[in-house]
Curated annotation (Swiss-Prot):
Subcellular location: Nucleus
Gene (UniProt): Rfx5
Organism: Mus musculus
Alphabetical list of PANTHER family matching this protein: DNA-BINDING PROTEIN RFX5 (PTHR12619:SF18), RFX TRANSCRIPTION FACTOR FAMILY (PTHR12619)
Record's protein name: DNA-binding protein Rfx5
GO biological process: negative regulation of transcription by RNA polymerase II
Source lineage: Eukaryota, Metazoa, Chordata, Craniata, Vertebrata
Domain notes: The N-terminus is required for dimer formation, association with RFXANK and RFXAP, assembly of the RFX complex, and for binding of this complex to its X box target site in the MHC-II promoter. The C-terminus mediates cooperative binding between the RFX complex and NF-Y.
Biased composition (Gly residues): 382-398, 406-422
Record GO cellular component, one term: nucleoplasm
Skewed-composition ranges (Basic and acidic residues): 1-10, 277-309, 465-476, 489-498, 648-658
Family: Belongs to the RFX family.
Role of this protein: Activates transcription from class II MHC promoters. Recognizes X-boxes. Mediates cooperative binding between RFX and NF-Y. RFX binds the X1 box of MHC-II promoters.
Assembly and binders: Homodimer. The RFX heterotetrameric complex consists of 2 molecules of RFX5 and one each of RFXAP and RFX-B/RFXANK; with each subunit representing a separate complementation group. Interacts (via PxLPxI/L motif) with RFXANK (via ankyrin repeats); the interaction is direct. RFX forms cooperative DNA binding complexes with X2BP and CBF/NF-Y. RFX associates with CIITA to form an active transcriptional complex.
Length: 658
């Protein structure tokens, strides 16, 4: 036993000098192991070693044999401590660059891990983490994700709910620009601390040039490049370097500001030397743009003043680029004010014309007819003007007889001539209207009468001393019968006169019938007058109906100017005395009711528009022809009405009832 002890100690004593020769390898291995073991484990190992040193050799051998040979349980617990190393950084960077939060997307766990594993294999410088450690890192970066099991029966998979793959993968980060390796002997003895700043500046300048060429943007420092990458999300904003850059950004800006100011001053000095004077090119480049925006609203005087200012300021520009830009711009002209715009000479004059409508009957469609009226010289005519007219009167003149209503044309004899104008005294002029006179008058041939049977007509306006503008359009509403060239009211009036003569002849044979409201004449006269008035008329028919109305009024009223009127009145009185007082009262009442029915008829106003044209001779000829036709029709109607009114007076006095 005594011999075995020294033999057992001999390897230790012999091993020490051998260990001294090979002391480099164990020390390096121990240092590496200590770096991978935590302080708590190291303290436990040191405590165990102190206890083991008290054991005997057999005890130590027994302890050695009892140590576990397979992978120990402590290796799994030691891996989380390794996450702060290079493998953790690679996994963290890959997750931030390839994944992003999205609440409506799910990714299978296995597909995410397979992509990470391929990335590590492509680098060939780090081994991939286990699936458990990889899942822990994902939960640290995206704490809101949830694990879900999705898929059909037999094909279900566990997924990360709340993340998705990025559609735009960010660029890999730029390599570090710190020159820590410059202290190594590989850089050579030429590298010294003095030129180190120059190397850093040169490297930063090259990097900025490269970034400008790639990103199509100018950068003044490497810090701006890094900030641009962070702002555009080209690199991860949650990395440690990003936090350091954000924290130290203000301090670096303060340090960089003086250098940028000096660079700006040097640039300004160079530009001023190139221009040959003080810094003035920037000021005249802006006023032309401002004046372009304001030139549209300025007055011509102010625009000319600003134009002179531009002309004076442009030569002051020293840069040829500014001069070329100003030369290419068009000449600015002031906008013309609204007051200088010449108005259109033509004006629209609208006059109303009283046209009778059918009492209680349906309204007929009234077309609109355009008439071209050339300027016509003044047409004089002497006629009374006591009735209302449409428009002003043109020219004074003595009247030979009073008239109770508006008339169309001018009268030269005792009686009412139509006139365009309202006045209680005698007037001289031609107008557009309708009226009746108590004295037999003669209508001049120059009275303006509207021709019928045409939609576009040329008619002259009577006696207007003022100059007329050409191209004035007026429209008149004319019934359909007139527009189509028909003249049904003439036939109706003839038929009515024939009916009255036949009815009067029949009454002579037998005893007249009595009606509760009055005699037959009393009821027939208003209907006749209403039918004549309500029927749509042409201008020629207006003359005929006006003549008949004048005769009716003449018969109904006891007094009337003119010798012809008195003679007719005497004949009527003599015959009335023979017939009896009853028939005389009936005739007077019928004439009065006819007049009242005519007065109660409401006139319908219509719009009239006239277009003055160039033709004057044709208008005068049309006016003359229509006036002659109107006078002839008036005379014919006058005779018919007298016959129809005098026929009932030749009744047999014996046939009248007691």
């Amino acid at each position: 036993m005594a011999e075995d002890k020294p033999d057992a100690k001999s390897p230790k004593t012999g091993a020490r000098p051998q260990g001294g020769a090979d002391a480099g390898e164990p020390t390096t291995l121990l240092q590496r192991l200590r770096g991978t073991i935590s302080k708590a484990v190291q303290n436990k190992v040191e405590g165990i070693l102190q206890e083991v040193q008290k054991f005997s050799d057999n005890d130590k051998l027994y302890l050695y044999l009892q140590l576990p040979s397979g992978p120990s349980v402590g290796e799994k617990s030691s891996e989380p401590s390794l996450l702060s190393n290079e493998e953790y950084m690679y996994a963290y960077r890959w997750i931030r660059n390839h994944l992003e939060e999205h609440m409506d997307t799910c990714l299978p766990k296995q597909s995410v891990y397979d992509a990470y594993r391929k990335y590590c294999e492509s680098l060939a410088c780090c081994r991939p983490l286990s699936t458990a450690n990889f899942g822990k890192i994902i939960r640290e970066i995206f704490p809101d994700i949830k694990a879900r099991r999705l898929g059909g029966r037999g094909q279900s998979k566990y997924c990360y709910s709340g993340i998705r793959r990025k559609t735009l993968v960010s660029m890999p980060p730029l390599p570090g620009l710190d020159l820590k390796g410059s202290e190594s002997p590989e850089m050579g003895p030429e590298v010294s601390p003095a030129p180190r700043d120059e190397l850093v500046e040169a490297a930063c300048a090259l990097t900025c040039d490269w970034a400008e060429r790639i990103l199509k943007r100018s950068f003044s420092s490497i810090v701006q490049v890094a900030r641009y990458l962070l702002q555009q999300h080209l690199i991860s904003a949650r990395s440690a370097h990003a936090h350091v850059l954000k924290a130290g950004g203000l301090a670096e800006e303060d340090e960089r500001a003086p250098r940028e100011r000096s660079l700006c001053k040097s640039k300004n000095v160079v530009e001023s030397l190139e221009g040959g004077g003080p810094k003035k090119p920037e000021r005249p480049a802006q006023p032309p743009k401002e004046q372009e925006a304001r030139a549209g609203t300025d007055l011509p005087g102010r625009a000319e003043r600003k134009k002179s200012v531009i002309d004076s300021s442009v030569p002051a520009a020293s840069k040829p680029q500014v001069n070329a830009l100003v030369a290419r711009l068009p000449v600015l002209l002031p906008r013309a004010p609204r007051s200088l715009i010449t108005p259109i000479s033509g004006t629209l004059k609208v006059a109303t014309l009283p046209l009778p409508t059918r009492v209680g009957g349906p309204q007929t469609a009234v077309p609109i007819i355009n008439m071209i009226l050339p300027p016509v010289p003044t047409l004089s005519g002497a006629g009374p003007g006591p009735g209302p007219g449409l428009g002003p009167r043109f020219g004074p003149g003595p009247g030979l007889g009073p008239g109770p209503g508006p008339g169309l044309g001018a009268g030269l004899g005792p009686g009412l001539g139509p006139g365009l104008g309202a006045g209680p005294g005698p007037g001289l002029g031609a107008g557009l209207g309708a009226g009746l006179g108590l004295g037999p008058g003669r209508v001049p041939p120059r009275a303006p009468i509207l021709p019928r049977g045409a939609e576009n007509r040329e008619v002259g306006i009577s006696s207007d001393p003022r100059p007329h503008d050409k191209g004035i359009k007026r429209t008149a509403e004319v019934p359909l019968s007139e527009a189509s060239g028909q003249d049904p009211p003439v036939k109706e009036m003839k038929h009515e006169t024939q009916d009255t003569t036949v009815s009067e002849a029949k009454r002579k044979r037998g005893r007249p019938r009595k009606k509760p409201g009055g005699s037959g004449e009393r009821n027939a006269t208003p209907e006749k007058s209403a039918a004549i008035v309500n029927s749509p008329r042409s201008p020629r028919l207006l003359w005929e109906t006006w003549g008949s109305k004048r005769e009716n009024n003449f018969i109904g009223r006891p007094e009337g100017p003119g010798p012809g009127g008195e003679a007719e009145r005497e004949t009527v009185l003599v015959q009335g005395q023979q017939d009896g007082a009853v028939s005389k009262g009936e005739r007077s009442l019928s004439s009065q009711e006819a007049k009242e029915a005519e007065d109660k008829i409401p006139p319908v106003t219509s719009k009239v528009s006239v277009i003055k044209g160039r033709i004057q001779k044709e208008a005068l000829q049309l006016v003359k022809g229509e006036a002659d036709a109107a006078t002839q029709g008036n005379k014919g109607l006058k005779g018919r009405v007298l016959q129809s009114s005098l026929t009932p007076e030749h009744k047999d006095p014996k046939a009248t009832p007691p």
